[in-house]
């Protein structure tokens, strides 16, 4: 995030590459090279920006949910000769590829085995890929236009010890990436995109916040408080510049 396109504060000192207590299912391949991963810098590491950006610079402020990063994307696909041959036997020809990814991998849709393991002292059990289950729950494959990727937070009863206190798998988008241009939509355009396509958006706490009118310590105190559900402590806030 060169000039604070994205800044983040969260209470954890380090972000894990893959959250514990989460069954990702059968890997299909590497994370797509044409989509950026979702890592974002912590604001404590960006103190120089208090001296390089104007104090009235405006940002969208959203909740930092405690779950696992999930990316869904759809690209154009040209059926092969083999695909066309299979179509004579009932195989449905598709003009697109839809992918579902964890933080580091694209996942196959057919993982359905059960695994039980320890998650920070609590037993966890999954019978299939949480990522594909959530994608199907929200019908993202049918809603997402070709040429776009949505990136968001997957939360659930056994993900991160259910920090957000939810009763089922839930998914909230925090970024929309235009694959054809190689650019993220601006915050306003992203919110419009999610509303238009009926895809859940991460809770927005301010659409024009000015973080650099605060000292770092005051900003850290500002982000303390409840998360999206009563009785849950917020993981922090994510700030994204309004025009980039």
Stretches found by the model and what they are:
Residues 1-244:
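Core nucleotide-handling region used for phosphoryl-transfer chemistry
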């Amino acid at each position: 995030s060169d000039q604070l396109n994205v800044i983040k504060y969260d209470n954890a000192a380090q972000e894990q590459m893959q959250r514990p207590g989460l069954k990702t299912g059968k890997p299909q391949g590497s994370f797509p090279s044409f989509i950026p991963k979702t890592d974002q810098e912590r604001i404590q590491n960006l103190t120089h920006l208090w001296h390089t950006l104007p104090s009235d610079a405006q940002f969208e402020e959203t909740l930092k949910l405690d779950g696992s990063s999930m990316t869904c994307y759809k690209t154009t696909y040209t059926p092969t000769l083999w695909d066309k041959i299979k179509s004579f036997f009932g195989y449905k020809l598709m003009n697109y590829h839809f992918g579902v990814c964890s933080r580091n991998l694209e996942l196959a849709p057919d993982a359905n085995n059960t695994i039980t393991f320890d998650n920070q002292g609590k037993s966890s059990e999954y019978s299939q890929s949480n990522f594909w289950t959530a994608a199907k729950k929200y019908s993202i494959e049918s809603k997402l236009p070709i040429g776009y990727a949505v990136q968001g937070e997957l939360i659930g009863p056994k993900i991160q010890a259910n920090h957000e206190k939810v009763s089922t798998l839930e998914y909230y988008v925090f970024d929309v990436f235009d694959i054809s241009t190689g650019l993220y939509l601006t915050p306003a355009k992203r919110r419009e995109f999610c509303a238009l396509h009926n895809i859940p958006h991460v809770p927005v706490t301010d659409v024009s916040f000015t973080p650099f009118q605060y000292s770092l310590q005051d900003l850290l105190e500002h982000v303390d408080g409840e998360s999206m559900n009563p009785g849950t402590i917020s993981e922090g806030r994510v700030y994204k510049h309004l025009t980039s």
